[in-house]
Amino acid sequence: KLKHLFERSFTYLFIVAIPISIGIAVLANDIVLEVYTETFLPSVLPLQILITGLTFSFISFLVGAFLNACDRQVTQTSIFGVVMVVNICCNIFLLPRYGVVGAASAALISDVLLVCLGWWFVPQVIVVSYRYIISVILRVGFSGVVMGLLVWYINQYVYFLVAIAFGVLI
């Protein structure tokens, strides 16, 4: 039952995170211009990098909550410690050279590492169906890419809020 709950939670979180991540990444330029001014256009790339990390943040929340609920708090805390050290090192190396893009990249690297390290310990508690997880990633990922391409295409011809509405319908 715990396995089923974990896999279903993964599915629902992935279904929510992918369209948001792809939609914002595709429309980042228009979103920044709508909310701010052209002065903030350099924030588009960092936004796109950070929003890519949203999917990993969603999944790391699931993995972390799962480990904590299964009495693996020490493991989860250790994972956070390792990721914190990696994040600091990435910022030390990337921030001076790449500025805010480097900081966003460090955050993305940390999000990915948090998922990978947490996922490493999940099989110690349950037997994960990797076939199921990969199936979800491929199906939802493909749908998200199709949505992103259509939103990007439509956004060239209509106001971006209309493109968002279209993306929601897809």
Where do the language-model regions lie?
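Helix-coil boundary and interhelical linker segments in multi-pass alpha-helical membrane proteins
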Residues: 30, 93, 97-102
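Specific pore-lining/lateral-gate transmembrane helices of multi-pass inner-membrane transport
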Residues: 1-81
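Alpha-helical transmembrane segments
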Residues: 63-71, 119-134
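A helix-boundary/kink motif common to multi-pass secondary transporters
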Residues: 72, 98-99, 103, 159
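Short alpha-helical transmembrane segments in multi-pass integral membrane proteins
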Residues: 5, 12-25, 80-81, 101-123, ...
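Membrane-embedded alpha-helical segments of multi-pass transporters/permeases
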Residues: 21-26, 34, 49, 88, ...
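Transmembrane alpha-helical segments of multi-pass transport proteins
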Residues: 83-86, 134-170
